[in-house]
Amino acid sequence: LIGMDAMDQAAIDRCMIELDGTENKTNLGGNAIYSVSVACYRAAAASCKRPLYDYIAGGRIKTVPIPSFNVLNGGMNAGIRQAFNEFIVMPYRASDIEQAVEIAVKVFNRLGTVIRAYTGAEPRVGGSYGWCAPSEDPEVCLDLIQKAIDDCGYSEQCAFALDCAMTEMYDREHKTYYLNGSQVTNDELVAYVKRLTEKYNFVFIEDMLDEDDWDGFVKAHREITRTYIIADDLTVSNPARIRRAYELKAIDGFILKPNQVGTITEALAAHKFASEHGMFSVTSGRSGGVVGDVVMDLAVGLQIPF
């Protein structure tokens, strides 16, 4: 790489991929390749004396993404098994980022009080730093969040989103999903989520089926029309799986994790594919990631919706 032009990101990434010579970057290592890719991206922006997000945009930035705040976590807690992984609040009518953060903080703090009143016990913090779900019933959880929103006076400014992570609730032997104390088929799960979208205001629902349940995603995308169906585990930032999802009309968009796809160039290519094929990408960090993650610059620079 010595002597290469830092402004030529594609050439740098291509060089590393060719030096590695494997399909999944096992020779040089995915972490090493990705770290160098990001470092070169930052260096190129710095040499132009521009913030990275501005360098990525290459022009006027018209808007910033709607922030998503994970306020309630599913999984097992105190004998309660909540199937859906993350209940998300989106202050989609906030006037700016500062107000969106203020709304989210107030709603989160109020939600702790609402949960305490519901259970009679101190709420616990979950693995993703939201409150632990106090009920197996997703509707109870959504109603409690809605009460917190209403109590704070933000009823007209907030919507929901869900990261269901239903791969974790899938029984591969019987081809059923755990939901609210029962095992259900993908048809029943799709019908249930459809009812939720008719009762509550959702921006998106992520990973509502198993990572290989292509038929289920196609059904969901066809049947559920009041919100966006997006994928993370289904697509894993993989170009072949993203293309298959597009061809099957299985999703509206997908989670794009740059260090999962491997290089900045490959991440930009995945985003470009989405933009050119009527889908959208949502950049995302990984658990345990750093505060200054490049995904923030990508989200703003690429004009990601949320």
Give the residues covered by each predicted segment.
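Beta-strand segments within the central parallel beta-sheet cores of soluble alpha/beta enzyme folds
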Residues: A11-R14, P51-N70, A159-C164, F204, ...
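Predominant activation on well-ordered alpha-helical scaffold segments within soluble catalytic domains
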Residues: D13, I17, Y34-A45, Y53, ...
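Short glycine-rich or small-residue beta-strand-to-loop segments that form or flank ligand, phosphate
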Residues: E23-N27, I88-M90, G130-C132, G253-K257, ...
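Glycine-rich anion-binding loops of enzyme active sites
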Residues: N31, G59-F87, W131-A159, E168
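Mobile "lid/hinge" segments at catalytic clefts and subdomain interfaces of large enzymes
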Residues: K62-R124, Y129
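Catalytic core of soluble alpha/beta enzymes
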Residues: A121-E122, E136-F306
